[in-house]
Amino acid sequence: MAKIAVFFGGSSTEHSISILTGCFICKTLHTMGHSVKPILLTKDGGWVVPSEYRMSIPFEVSNSPDLFQEEFQKRYGVSRTNQIFSLDADIVFLGLHGGQGEDGTIQGFLEILGIPYTGSGVLASAIAMDKTRANQIFLQSGQKVAPFFEIDKLEYLNSTDAVITKLETLGFPQFLKPVEGGSSVSVYKITNREQLKEKLALIFESDSKVMSQSFLTGIEVSCGVLERYRDGKFKKIALPATEIVPGGEFFDFESKYKQGGSHEITPARISEQEMKRVQELAIAAHRSLGCSGYSRTDFIIVNGEPHILETNTLPGMTETSLIPQQAKAAGISMEEVFSDLIEIGLKRSLY
């Protein structure tokens, strides 16, 4: 059995979801017999690093990030950032979402330290987090995406009216979102010019680049991809896609993570041909971005043709997340999924 450090928390807007992911990962690894060291990245950039490998996590308050951090620090002391440089882990299991946890920053840090980790490498993580760059790669690979524009803050400040007029050519409704972000945080469905101006100003308060994309009507599905090492070869498999029926206007943060926020159906209620096509495209997206270990790609099926919405390199791994749902539908246990992720991470570190 391995000594595994689990990174979770972080300073992104997805901190609370990462805590739930981290708790689920720690529980699962513990049942598998691994030595687990939960390492909490605090909202203000600190690290709470236990001195020993022992499973003591305040699961009972995992739904309250502030209380969770308080209880976690009671057990393990204050932030010990310096201890991360002498981390004695066989591998780091990444349970982070968004921001520096998913954009290649943490991955690069671990590369410098020479510590193997789960999931995609620096380049794939950075590209997938940048929605504009990812869409450009998808288009170059012959895949379909909704029409889009990227606007940077300086362009907006210098030519606000021109920017608004440009974005209006996408038509209404359209989706406005930060170029770098996840879990549909700060994603807005825009229906008119005034709302466009209002939400652009709001997003630019905390982000430097915005992408607006035409609204497509269709069936929303999401498909996970797992990598495995079998018979001396690396293999990629696509899981059964999940159909997303949002409780609101679209599959936003509330729909994803609040109880009753959306209705998720696995396998999706689509034709066999559509399912096969979605799975093929999910693997193609994974390959195009250079992902490793696992990924999850969201689609919208318009008149039988899937269009890519985005690819997540560190998809949610809470008890209600899509990857666990899809793995179960495929007859794959989460213990097997985690074993494969660990094996892929360790083997990749050798090259």
From Swiss-Prot:
Localization per record: Cytoplasm
Function: Cell wall formation.
PROSITE patterns: ATP_GRASP, DALA_DALA_LIGASE_1, DALA_DALA_LIGASE_2
Keywords carried by this UniProt record: ATP-binding, Cell shape, Cell wall biogenesis/degradation, Cytoplasm, Ligase, Magnesium, Manganese, Metal-binding, Nucleotide-binding, Peptidoglycan synthesis
NCBIfam families, alphabetized: D_ala_D_alaTIGR, PRK01372.1, PRK01966.1-4, PRK14572.1
Binding site for Mg(2+) 1: 298, 310
Residues annotated for ATP binding in this entry: 167-222
Organism: Leptospira interrogans serogroup Icterohaemorrhagiae serovar Lai (strain 56601)
Binding site for Mg(2+) 2: 310, 312
Top enzyme category: ligase
GO cellular component: cytoplasm
Cofactor annotation: Mg(2+); Mn(2+)
Family assignment from sequence similarity: Belongs to the D-alanine--D-alanine ligase family.
InterPro entries the record matches: ATP-grasp (IPR011761), ATP_grasp_subdomain_1 (IPR013815), D-Ala_lig_Van_CS (IPR000291), D_ala_D_ala (IPR005905), Dala_Dala_lig_C (IPR011095), Dala_Dala_lig_N (IPR011127), PreATP-grasp_dom_sf (IPR016185)
Pathway the protein contributes to: Cell wall biogenesis; peptidoglycan biosynthesis
Gene this protein is translated from: ddl
Protein name: D-alanine--D-alanine ligase
EC assignment: 6.3.2.4
Any Pfam family matching the protein: Dala_Dala_lig_N
Top-level taxon of the source organism: Bacteria
